[in-house]
């Protein structure tokens, strides 16, 4: 292992498996959501049955009144290359860190990196921009079956149309008994999705409390849900439509797979489109770039948060339900996209006139007290280290020097209030991702003074 990697031993907590939350990547783990289209096209406020745009996250914040003004980010390890995810083993104190360039590294219970990568996929992947090694989830029965699931960007494979940029690959690997290696030769391809553009790849993986694997998929890239690889849909006011299509491809959606029930997978019987028109893998749709997802470890564990990166004006987090349509590209957040007005539901002949659901968390790129550039998701805090955070959704934004937020249901209205939390005791250039250990404590990943860094969230001094 490169000697420039710094080890921090006092901060590490062992724990159970975790979903990953994170950011928008490039070859160094950085990229904004501008898409380079330069249009600046935003959605006018107050149209299409959404929010009127008056809630900028500064309303009375009764559920957030005990949230601390600042949180410390304590360095666990640095000197990494674009860390975009962290996953905790359920059977040991080991944690696995994903580098977007293609390596999975392991931290032992003291916070020290193992000398060799657990898995090195730098050779077979396509990296750069928003591509690369993007997601990892350990099977709920990892302690006994040793199955790890990885998603990455690969050169175009058989079945990917000419002119497409790459192929999304979901694959399984078998871990050694001691968890220090994922056997390269054990790779089994679970799913391949042709990706027309280089961006909007989403990237996360997470097992739900039902034992099924949840897989967010971006809308196919470019800007505005348009360009090569995008299909026509029911909405004629804006071109493109992968986010609103559920029949032609799997783009712009959240998938739900039973990886134990078939070869390579089966469809859960209660997926919303089973027996209906559309691809059975779909669980929810209407997403642009759902970069990171997380389940709340509290209660029954079924609350599912999806952080969806916006186009030019709004960032959003959705509390997702089966069969939910989250609006893209009819709407960006709770606002009409590129039109003065827009419908609040699909036509009756499109899945019975389903509603376009508002996000629970939304903030603008400019013009509000709470602003950002690309939401990177987060977790509901269930730890004990930080007073006042219990039950609060803690998340971040890719803005320069990073932004840390807290949100929870407020008094009235469907959009939750947001509080900005100051970052104490760390030099942060960008935040890429969040993770959570089995004790409910949270971790941030990003770039700092010494390169790619994993921090543990703790109380400010």
Sequence positions of predicted segments:
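Repeat-solenoid scaffold signature
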Residues: 279-316
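N-terminal Sec signal peptide cleavage junction
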Residues: 22-26
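Blade-edge beta-strand/turn elements of extracellular beta-propeller
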Residues: 62-78, 112-128, 173-196, 232-292, ...
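Acidic, Gly/Ser/Thr-rich repeat motifs that build Ca2+-stabilized beta-propeller blades
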Residues: 53-222, 295, 303-309, 368-411, ...
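Beta-rich catalytic cores
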Residues: 82, 132, 201, 250, ...
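N-terminal secretory signal peptides and thylakoid transit peptides that target proteins
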Residues: 1-18
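Ser/Thr/Gly/Pro-rich low-complexity, disordered linker/stalk segments of secreted
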Residues: 30-59
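Short, conserved, GDST-rich strand-edge loop motifs in beta-rich repeat architectures
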Residues: 154-163, 216-247, 314-315
